[in-house]
Amino acid sequence: VSVDCSGYPKPECTAEETPLCGSDNKTYRNKCNFCNAVVESNGTLTLRHFGKC
């Protein structure tokens, strides 16, 4: 399972609720929040699955 995070990080994310579960066992609100975190982690954060953890 993967998400295309090209074009990130973005300065602001919407409040859209489309949860993703990261490899850090944290639920991210949406793709934007998740991709920003992926960039911050230098690519060490990956997608565990779609939906809440």
From Swiss-Prot:
Superkingdom field: Eukaryota
Keyword Repeat: yes
UniProt site (Reactive bond 3): A15, E16
Domain Kazal-like residues, every copy: 3-53
PANTHER family with a match to the protein in the record: SERINE PROTEASE INHIBITOR KAZAL-TYPE 7 (PTHR47499:SF1), SERINE PROTEASE INHIBITOR KAZAL-TYPE 7 SPINK7 (PTHR47499)
Major subcellular location class: secreted
Name of protein: Ovomucoid
